[in-house]
Curated annotation (Swiss-Prot):
Ranges of Basic and acidic residues composition bias in the record: 63-83
Name recorded for this polypeptide: Natriuretic peptide BF131
Entries under InterPro entries matching the protein: Natr_peptide (IPR000663)
The protein's role, per its UniProt record: Natriuretic peptide that dose-dependently induces the rapid relaxation of rat aortic strips phenylephrine-precontracted. Acts by stimulating cGMP production in a dose-dependent manner (by probably activating NPR1 and/or NPR2). May also show potent hypotensive effects.
Region (Disordered): 54-83, 105-127
UniProt entry keywords in alphabetical sequence: Disulfide bond, Hypotensive agent, Secreted, Signal, Toxin, Vasoactive, Vasodilator
Disulphide bonds in the chain: 94-110
UniProt KW Transit peptide keyword: no
Subcellular location: Secreted
Taxonomic source organism: Bungarus flaviceps flaviceps (Red-headed krait)
Pfam families: ANP
Length: 148
């Protein structure tokens, strides 16, 4: 058995609810809710509003368009000129071929890319060579003059 101290802590309330439960279930079911009297003017206004809010109704499309795209109502004009131009033919792969022409090349990857041939080194002109000899001779003369 359960001691009286355990029942005082909240078990007593549970026992009381369990004892009263059969009495509550013997009652009659709740009556159905009464329908509100309909006003024909209010009903037709509500129906018009609901018809206007349906997405499939043609009468709601102009109102929706004005809400979604307000710039067109204020003389927005054609928006195509604001879009970026198409970038046809600008896609170049890593080996300087158009992307739709990749299958027609023999080297299919970037690591096989060949750099353009370099120009052969130009022959040095006579002027820098003469200046180099002159500087070398001047240094040799200055070393000899210091040694003397």
């Amino acid at each position: 058995m359960v001691g009286p101290s355990r029942l005082a802590g909240g078990g007593l309330l549970l026992l009381l609810l369990l004892a009263l439960l059969p009495l509550a279930l013997d009652g009659k079911p709740a009556p159905p809710p009464q329908a509100l009297p309909k006003d024909p003017a209010a009903a037709s206004a509500a129906e018009r509003i609901m018809r206007a809010l349906l997405p499939d109704s043609k009468s709601s499309r102009p109102a929706t368009d004005r809400m979604v795209h307000p710039e067109h109502q204020a003389g927005g004009g054609d928006t195509r000129r604001l879009q970026e131009p198409a970038k046809k033919g600008l896609l170049i792969s890593c080996f300087d071929r158009r992307i739709d022409r990749i299958s027609h090349t023999s080297d299919m990857g970037c690591r096989h890319r060949k750099d353009p041939p370099r120009a052969p080194p130009a022959a040095p002109s006579a002027a820098p060579l003469a200046v180099t000899w002159l500087i070398r001779d001047l240094r040799a003369d200055s070393k000899q003059s210091r040694a003397a």
